[in-house]
């Protein structure tokens, strides 16, 4: 094979990028062990110049378009950070390492070689989803480490930044720094942006930009959107993206309006009331649970407006966009709700049942415990709010660290179940719960088929659900075991923290701030994989095609 000039240039570029990545790592090591060296600053300036040269080369070679400018936006942002923000060498060098790794992955050294890494990634939607979340967390961590992101005198460590960025992007709500006092307005806006991106999904937002720019969604992007949104078909995917954006903005603005008038009545000034209203509205709809108050929403336990607005936003964000679209279509066409899709019927019915059961359980369990001394109205508010938020939101109006054992157990179950497919929440999802329960009931009754609302559930779906639940339980059990090894906390608190992270809930029994570095890393993994999904992970690292070319002889085994 004759090596072309382009191949030589690409190989040379890979060598240069590799050298720069290694040198960056070495300089960061020197920085961490407090060795002051003027070479570090000089190298940072050279790196900025090279990055400017790289951007200019790309634009001159390919031409200037809106899409290409959007693709180069992270590079442009970090050039300004490197030039304008003081004490940003460490952050900029972290960005360069990540940028160079991405460049190495994107380089197509062997143009005629099939099975390139980039092709395998781009042809596998689950892998793309995982990588987009990963790089969003990476960029968010860098931004949160900037001096401008924290108040004067405070410092955000690398692990703390990764933890916070992961929690925001995966819409969890577990924190190692108090959001309202540790971070500046800039840092809080970074967190809010990560929440919105993580809640809607990176692919949803990028697809929305593509539609705005007048581009058509490719089959590959439609496949990714189908995976992210929970749609059962690829039909009308452009309208789905539009509806997701419109519904999100409408509901968040509506929730923010209700919260704004409530905060104004609490002696907030206009700007503060507006900002707090928008922040908590977005956080609630995205099921994130981030609050600007150190006690979450405990101060508003008896406030009807805030309880109503927050819980409504959480529920709407948790049922999923396909269900909201189905409800909208049903109302618009003035047809019976019996015409809803099977998916919508399962989600709505299971949500109502779980909310009702959760409210009753918390009302009984905390009657003489955390709610002792409350009047009936406050008990109902607190019980209902706890039932709603435990399923993935993470806000709280009562002290979660003082929950009774019964409430802790019930919370663990609700957190593991989580929200619904295509929603902003996590967990194994309500549809999985219903399918498993109905399948077990059908087996006990001797029924061959699994039927829900007079519709048969395919065997393929049942196998996927079983795989999802099994993978979730196995992964969660492993992470709990590791947490118990590295942390001194009680079994109850450790299990609660792990399930909360995996279900992207954000409730804690007060141990998050005291976690060791190893414990924080485990929680980060739980939050990330809890949001991406165990089943997505399984599909991402293995071929999904059936490779069974023959079958073995069947033989019975003893069970029980």
Sequence positions of predicted segments:
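Membrane-proximal intracellular helices of multi-pass ion channels
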Residues: 1-560
């Amino acid at each position: 094979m004759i090596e072309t000039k382009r191949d030589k240039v690409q190989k040379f570029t890979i060598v240069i990028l590799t050298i720069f990545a290694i040198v960056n790592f070495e300089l960061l090591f020197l920085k961490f062990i407090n060795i002051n060296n003027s070479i570090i600053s000089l190298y940072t300036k050279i790196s900025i110049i090279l990055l400017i040269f790289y951007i200019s080369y790309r634009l001159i070679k390919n031409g200037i378009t809106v899409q290409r400018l959007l693709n180069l936006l992270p590079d442009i942002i970090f050039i300004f950070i490197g030039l304008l923000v003081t004490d940003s060498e460490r952050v900029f060098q972290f960005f360069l390492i990540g940028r160079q790794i991405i460049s190495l992955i994107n380089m197509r050294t062997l143009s005629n070689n099939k099975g390139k890494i980039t092709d395998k990634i781009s042809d596998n939607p689950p892998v793309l989803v995982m990588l987009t979340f990963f790089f969003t967390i990476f960029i968010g961590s860098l931004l949160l480490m900037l001096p401008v992101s924290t108040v004067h005198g405070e410092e955000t460590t690398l692990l703390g930044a990764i933890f916070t960025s992961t929690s925001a992007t995966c819409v969890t709500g577990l924190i190692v720094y108090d959001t309202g006092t540790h971070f500046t307005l800039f840092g809080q806006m970074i967190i809010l942006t990560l929440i919105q991106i993580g809640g809607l999904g990176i692919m949803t937002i990028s697809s929305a930009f593509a539609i705005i720019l007048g581009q058509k969604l490719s089959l590959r992007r439609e496949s990714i959107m189908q995976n992210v949104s929970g749609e059962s078909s690829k039909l009308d995917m452009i309208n789905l993206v539009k509806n997701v954006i419109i519904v999100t903005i409408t509901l968040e603005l509506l929730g923010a309006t209700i919260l704004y008038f409530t905060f104004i009545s609490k002696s907030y000034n206009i700007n503060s009331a507006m900002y707090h209203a928008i922040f908590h509205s977005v956080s609630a709809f995205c099921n994130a649970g981030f609050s600007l108050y150190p006690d979450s929403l405990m101060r508003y336990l008896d406030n009807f407006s805030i309880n109503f607005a927050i819980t409504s936003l959480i529920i709407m964000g948790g049922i999923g966009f396909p269900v909201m679209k189905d409800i909208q279509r049903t109302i618009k066409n003035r047809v019976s709700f019996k015409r809803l899709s099977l998916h919508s019927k399962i989600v709505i019915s299971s949500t109502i049942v779980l909310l009702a059961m959760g409210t009753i359980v918390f009302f009984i369990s905390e009657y003489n415990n955390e709610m002792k001394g409350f009047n009936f109205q406050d008990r109902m508010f607190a019980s209902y709010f706890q039932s709603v938020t435990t399923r993935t939101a993470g806000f709280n109006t009562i002290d979660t660290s003082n929950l009774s054992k019964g409430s802790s157990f019930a919370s663990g179950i609700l957190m593991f179940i989580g929200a619904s497919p295509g929603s902003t929440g996590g967990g194994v999802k309500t549809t999985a719960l219903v399918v498993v329960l109905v399948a077990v009931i059908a087996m006990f009754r001797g029924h061959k088929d699994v039927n829900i609302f007079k519709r048969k559930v395919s065997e393929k779906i049942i196998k996927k659900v079983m795989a999802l639940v099994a993978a979730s339980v196995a992964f969660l059990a492993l992470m709990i075991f590791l947490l118990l090894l590295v942390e001194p906390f009680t079994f109850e608190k450790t299990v609660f923290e792990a399930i909360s992270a995996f279900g992207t809930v954000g409730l804690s029994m007060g141990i998050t701030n005291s976690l060791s570095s190893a414990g924080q890393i485990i929680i980060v993994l739980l939050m990330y994989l809890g949001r991406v999904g165990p089943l997505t992970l399984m599909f991402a690292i293995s071929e999904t095609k059936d490779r069974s070319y023959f079958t073995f002889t069947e033989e019975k085994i003893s069970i029980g």
